[in-house]
Every structure is written in C-alpha cells, then in structure tokens.
Design a protein with these regions (language model features):
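Bacterial N-terminal signal peptides that target proteins for export
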Residues: 1-9
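Conserved small-residue
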Residues: 20-433, 438-513
Length: 513
C-alpha cells in the first residue's frame, strides 16, 4: 500500500534539492604542453643578458597563447569555453583573519572585482588621486603559485612557518630577523621553479593581473584605445620630455582621444574599421551619461572612433553578483547589470622562469599599433596566438636594462595601468624594477578615510625613478622590510584587519623624497 503523505514529502524534498542553486566549481588547470612553458632558466637568462628580443618576443607570445588555450571547462550559465587563465585561483587565496585557507584544487566560478591596487598604493609619491577610469582588476595565480601562497614557509630550517597570505604572519616574519641580517637575506622563500628535463615538463609559478572594462549586453559601448602619448588630451603640453621628467605626464585612459565602439550586436566576423557617423551618434548618450557622473573631469575623451565586434577582445558575461561587485569598486558612470560583459583590455603576466621573473604585459590594441610601437606592439606575434588574442599588443622586461652591462633602461609599462598619476614616472617604468621593490614591514597603516578601519602592512614606495637599475640585494630602502620575491600581491592582497595588532612605528624608508 502506498503512503500518500510519504510520497508527497519525498516529492517535495526532491523538488527542493533539484531547484536549489548549486555552487559551480572550476578546477585550476595548468598551461598545456606546446606553448614553450616552462622554459630553461639558464637559456632564458642568456637571452635576457644578451637582450635577445628575437627569442624573448616569440616566447612571450606563445605564453599569451597558452594562457588563452581552451581549458575544457565552461562559464556557468553561458556554456562558453573558459580559457586556462580564468580557471586559476584568485584573491580568495587570501582569507579573512578568522577563516581557513581555501581549497586550492578548485574555485568558485565568480570574479572578485576591485580597482587596480597600484592606483591606491599606501606609499605613493604624492597625494592619492581618485581614478576616473572605468576599469576593474583582480589577481590570478597558477596552481604552483597558489600552493606556494597557501603553504607555510620557515625563515630558517627547523624554525616556525610563516604564511604569505596573511598580514599578521608576514609582520611576524619581518619582526623575527636579527638586527644585522643583510638585506638579501630578509626575504620570503623564492616562488617555485622546476627546470624541464627528459620526461619532466618542469613547472614555474605565475601571477596575472587582468584588467577589464564594461560593455553593455545589448548596447555598443565605447572603450578607450591607446594611441601613444600623442593620442591623449593636451599631450603637447603635458607629456613633453620636460614634463615626463618632472612626473607630470599621466595619459590615463580617461584622456585617450581614440575609442573603440565595442558592439555586442555585430556579427563575430565583422571587421575592425573606422566607425560611421551613425555608430558614433549611437554611443553619444552613453558617453554623456558617463561624463556627467564626474563633472569637471571626463571619464571618456573620445574624438576618433573605431567600430569592433565583441569578438575582437576576450570577454565573459557577468552574473548578478559579479555586476554588484563591479559597481562596488567606486567606478563612476556606467553601472553593470547581470549579463553585461567584462572585456579584457590588459593583463600583466610574470613567470618564475627567471630568478627575477620574466615580465610581459599585454593590452588591447585593435587596428594599427601605437606610433613608434611605444611601449610595445603586435610585432613578432606567433601563429599560436589565435582569435581575439591577435588584437593585443605587448612589451617585455626580462631585464632592468637592455642587456647585461647596458646602461639603457628598459621601458615596458601597461598603458591601462601605469599611466596613473598615483604611480611615479609610470611612462618611464619597467615591470622588473617596479616589482623588485615589493616588500612588507611589521608596522600597519589604516587605509580607510572613514570608519570602519582597514589596517594593512606598510610597504615601501614604488621606485622613485628609473634612471638606473636597482641592486635589490643592497637597496637601502629595504631597511626594516622583508622583500616578497617581486610579488606585489603578497603585500597587497591579504585581508585588512579591523584594528592595529602591534602599534609598531613605521619604517624610516617609506616614501619617495
């Protein structure tokens, strides 16, 4: 005999379980074979010492291709293929003080947007300027780097372990050094690298900083496009050699005169071409909406327009939670909604294939390259780069100078990031010199302008200039600090504390003169 009540109860339970939203999980996936990663450290160092860009450039492009290889996983809700890089763990590896370290073997399929942290560096060269650019960012770490960040590391054999993903542990690490410890020894353990050998692919830690803009799901949306220093507002007066030397040249994306009308309604095979008057008129209301949100300081300065399909750059659709996170980053102007697109406009990429890491940075460059290929270009791109990836430019910094023994400094910056006025001499910078100054003190600073307090570890300034290479083993500004193996993520990504845990004084070497 059947029991109607029991049957009804079981049916209701089954329906509730079936209808309950499930957290989709993504498995972090390494770059597959075939993309020259990782390479031989000895060989790559020889290229860097000889400034052998004929070998460095294709290696960097193959790395770009490998990052965007199909992971075999999809974006939940859309079923669209997910590239390798987006399977990797992000800043969830830095848990709140009372929370356990997350499982690095999987991640939730969401993105934690925030403004680029270098725009708010706690030890800058001057007053922090509020950005007016419509971009967000986050960090990504390949499986080797994720394991490194979440495991304990002793400062000396047999000693206590310190965790590089928590501020209190980093402060304790810095405090335990004897007073006479040389600068070169006041450091975290090096991120992992294993050389390839017969029968072993090898491995190397990797960090990424993707930078994304918003494109509305059903509306063509303008996105600034870099056209060199001369392609920004008033560049003839603000970016002269004298103004550059005085750190007055900061052509941020909000000042760029060229914009691409990214059209989600255009066919995927539509060409990148000059926009028509009708297409330009179509985005005028959006531009007015964006600029009216910040009177007196334009967010978009478009005067020349391209028209591109959405397929011309990498993108994914945002969930409602991601749209909310996007809108919470204090971005003025357009507001994101579920289904809108986050489009990849830039990405910093660094790998532990060198002791000082390899450095390459990519930015969206539809159409022609910037004048004088500054600071980089699409030249030398390999056939492994396909699809939207071929619309990005790149520069590399495998050495601080253009070869060992050279006095000519490398210039390699990302136009979407290092043009910020909060970054000293960004248009003269290079990735290796900048990241080489990453370090933590034991003292904390409150970075909140109003309650509640957000206490973070103090760090040294970014380099004050790029006139000469830094000797990181003897750099005097590291007095009182522990260097973090060229990773600004280690000093920047741990969760802030609600109160100062130690009330220690700040180091003497904190800001640029």
């Amino acid at each position: 005999m059947r029991h109607p009540v029991r049957t009804l109860l079981l049916t209701c339970v089954c329906i509730l379980v079936a209808c309950k939203p499930r957290d989709p999980w993504i498995t972090p996936t390494p770059i597959p074979p075939g993309y020259d990663f990782p390479g031989s450290r000895e060989e790559i160092q020889q290229w860097a010492d000889a400034w052998n860009t004929a070998r460095i450039t294709p290696k960097a492009w193959n790395l770009w291709a490998g990052l965007h290889a199909d992971s075999g996983q999809v974006y939940p809700g859309t079923g669209l293929p997910m590239p390798i890089w987006d399977t990797w763990n992000g800043e969830e590896l830095f848990p709140a003080p009372d929370q356990p370290t997350p499982d690095v073997s999987r991640r939730k399929a969401t993105h934690g947007f925030h403004g680029p942290r270098q725009f708010h560096h706690p030890a800058g060269s001057g007053p922090v300027v509020t950005p007016t650019d419509q971009l967000v960012s986050f960090n990504k770490f390949n499986p080797e780097m994720a394991a490194y960040l979440t495991q304990g590391h002793p400062a000396a054999p047999g000693g206590p372990s310190f965790f590089y993903n928590r501020f209190t542990s980093l402060a304790d690490l810095n405090s335990q050094w004897p007073a006479n410890t040389p600068t070169a020894q006041r450091t975290v353990q090096q991120a992992p690298y294993t050389a390839p050998s017969a029968g072993n692919r090898g491995s190397a830690a990797m960090e990424l900083k993707p930078v994304l803009y918003l494109v509305k799901k059903q509306k063509p949306t303008p996105v600034p496009v870099w056209r060199g220093l001369a392609g920004s507002v008033n560049s003839d007066t603000t970016c002269t050699p004298e103004q550059q030397e005085a750190d007055k040249c900061h052509p941020t994306p909000s000042l760029w005169l060229t914009c691409a009308i990214v059209d989600p309604t255009a066919p995927a095979d539509a060409p990148i071409e000059e926009a028509t008057p009708e297409q330009i008129q179509g985005v005028a209301p959006l531009i007015d909406q964006v600029n009216s949100a910040h009177p007196g300081s334009a967010i978009l300065s478009c005067e020349h327009y391209l028209h591109t399909p959405l397929s011309a750059l990498y993108s994914f659709q945002m969930t409602a939670d991601e749209a909310k996170a996007f809108n919470s980053t204090n971005i003025e102007g357009l507001q994101a909604e579920a289904g809108d697109y986050a489009v990849l406009t830039a990405m910093h990429v660094n790998t532990k294939e060198l002791a000082n890491w390899t450095w390459q940075t990519f930015w969206w460059q539809p159409g022609s390259d910037a004048p004088d290929d500054f600071p980089g270009s699409k030249k030398g791109m390999t056939d492994k780069v396909t699809g939207a990836g071929r619309n990005y430019a790149m520069c590399t910094a495998y050495n601080q100078t253009q070869g060992r023994g050279s006095s000519k400094m490398t210039v390699c910056f990302n136009p979407y990031l290092e043009t910020s006025p909060n970054i000293p001499l960004g248009v003269q910078s290079n990735c290796m010199t900048c990241h080489g100054t990453a370090a933590v003190a034991s003292a904390f600073a409150n970075t909140a302008s109003s309650p509640p307090a957000t206490w973070v570890l103090q760090t040294p300034s970014y380099p004050c200039d790029y006139k000469a290479p830094i000797n990181f083993a003897t750099y005097p500004w590291f007095t009182g600090f522990t260097t973090t193996d060229f990773s600004w993520a280690i000093p920047a990504d741990p969760q802030p504390l609600p109160q100062n845990p130690n009330n220690l004084p700040s180091p003497a070497t904190l800001n640029c003169p």
